[in-house]
Each structure stands twice: as C-alpha cells, then as structure tokens.
Amino acid sequence: MPISRTYAALVVWLLVPAVAGAQSANAAVAPGSPTADRLPIYEIDPTCPPTLPNDWILGDIRGLFVDDRDHLWVIHMPSSLTPQEIGAAVKPPIADCCFPAPPVLELDPDGKVLRTWGGPGDGYTWYDQEHGIYLDHNGFVWTGTSNGHHVMKFTQDGKHVLTIGTPGVNKGSNDPDHLGGPANFYVEPKTNEIFIADGYI
C-alpha cells in the first residue's frame, strides 16, 4: 500500500521536534555543566526491601508512594504471580515457598514491613488488577485499578472509607458517568478535591 504524502509529512512533523528535543535535552545535562551538578544521583540499594516476612513475594508492582515520614507505600498485583512462584499457596501445595504478599504494604526507611492489607472485604469490591497508590494530606490512602472502574479511599490500617465509581461498570471511552481505568490520583490540600487520571479505557 503506498504511503500518502499527508502520512509522510505527519511522520516527519512528529519526528523532527522529537529528535531536536532529545538533542537539546542531552546538551542541557552534559557532564560538568551546572545543570548536571544539581541533578540527583540515584543508587540501587540491593538490600531494600529486605526479605519479606511469612515467605511473601510481590507480584507486578503497580504503584509506589513515599509519604512525609519517608515510608514507602507499595501496591502490587498478587494475581500476576504464577502457581510456580507461589507454590506453597496453591491447593494442594506444590512447593515449600512462597505466598503472595497482601496487595498494600507500608515499609519504613530501613525497609521493614510495618503494615499490610488489601483484598476482599465487607462493604467494598476489591480489585483484580490493582493500580496506583497515593497518600493525601490527611493521611488517607487512595488506591485504584486499571480495569475495575473505581477508586477507593482507606485509612492507613486498611479500613474502607469511600468508593468512587461503580465496580465493573463502564460504557466505553465516551461514558461521562463512569470511570474507565483510573491510573493515578491527587488530592488538592486547599480544596480537598481529588483529581483522577482515568488513563485506561
């Protein structure tokens, strides 16, 4: 199939600014430049997190948040783990290890697990694909799902406070009344309003 001139022009129009932007970005952070000296340097800490208790392992990590105490909040997707990875949890067990960790974990700056929670409970529908975690200015924990069409608010101990959206209900990308797949959230402290990035449809 021949490529139209319009299509070719569009590709060039998109690529030229991208290449130019990448070159200027590289020049802006050249080693020894004043800008490069101010950039943070990150190092991998292979000891964090330490071995989790209870023979727990994490599935796909779907969200991280560092609170004002430097505690790391993690939300992961236990359903992403294979039976071979959680051999002790399958019925009947096929191995001595391991078990899926609860979906939400709080770790202190040293990597010690302080709290865990998440999963099905009374009064709310838990997710099958967890996605995103955020702590607001009042200390509430917000979580979401990439396919369940709702966001939930919890206390730091995992007590359900609020659900926004209707679990399992969405009428497509033009549906003004339901969430698609909320990807992230932010609560504005001045107004106490939540902003939801509805990034998956």
Could you tell me what each predicted segment is?
Residues M1-R5:
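N-terminal secretory signal peptides that target proteins for export/translocation
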Residues T6-Y7, C48:
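Hydrophobic alpha-helical segments and their boundary regions
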Residues A8-G21:
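Bacterial N-terminal signal peptides
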Residues Q23-I201:
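Eukaryotic scaffold repeat domains enriched in small/polar residues
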